[in-house]
């Protein structure tokens, strides 16, 4: 859907509308920074005007005092109930980056059934890095850490560390082994994105894992007119996420199925 690409670019621009930040190397800290955007977009990006829900969730479980993240969890539930993984397909800047890389003229790989089973890893990562490790560090040392942001999140390197290091030479020297590890992980993810469709979203992203739980229940998303459906499965054969059923947990509501449906039985909107 051509409209989807426009929406993706608009979201990326709106999330990072603090253009002076890219010139000055300063992180915006105004009142909008207390508002979470729905997609994955690093808080520390010099252009970011809102907060990342994953970062906000972890910050509540980090530091010397624990705070139950009522606001962030409530917001994620609202986003999930309304849109599910439609947010992944339409309003996530890091998803857009992966899709653009996939358009490069490289050999493409469809995941085998064995590899598709590993999509459950994003749920393991969500529990381990978003909850268990922050709490474990807190009870062991008296201070929690934002484990996913610190050890895994590639958006933090792409959108924050690299731009800030390019703008401010003074911060380059302190970058150490952890930066090198995350840079390597980013390179692996971006390289893999050229031949596997949205690998980070499928295997690693906690936000995708959380929204996927609401996919079948969300108000908006892919819907099928069963009176028009002829059961040809052309929709599934052309699904870039290799969904086993329309609207399942891996579906990002990109609309590729609707474009190839011979009877126009598939549409995107209120279910």
Whereabouts are the PLM-identified features?
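Non-ligating segments of multi-cofactor redox enzymes
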Residues: 1-242, 249-250, 255-271
